[in-house]
């Protein structure tokens, strides 16, 4: 597993498990909102009034509506503008 995914998967999984509302900004500037229903190596399934399959290569930023604890002993990822990831932790 690459270093980039050692935080990505636990982060997305925590958002999915806790049903945290997220704003997903795409590289073209479009903002999508909803909850993460599922994800894999290439796509994120975002649910609002409908489900949207969004390719990860099109995603610029994922902003949770509240702080999310990543992994069992991991740090928190802060919500809002300028949030920073906490300590990395694998599940």
From Swiss-Prot:
CDD domains, sorted: Hfq
Domain of life according to the entry: Bacteria
Keyword Transport: no
GO CC terms in record: cytosol
GO terms for MF: RNA binding
Entry annotated with the keyword Transmembrane helix: no
Domain Sm: 9-68
Key words, A-Z: RNA-binding, Stress response
One GO-annotated biological process of the protein: regulation of RNA stability
Subunit structure, interactors included: Homohexamer.
Family: Belongs to the Hfq family.
Function, as annotated: RNA chaperone that binds small regulatory RNA (sRNAs) and mRNAs to facilitate mRNA translational regulation in response to envelope stress, environmental stress and changes in metabolite concentrations. Also binds with high specificity to tRNAs.
Protein name: RNA-binding protein Hfq
Organism: Stenotrophomonas maltophilia (strain K279a)
High-level lineage: Bacteria, Pseudomonadati, Pseudomonadota, Gammaproteobacteria, Lysobacterales
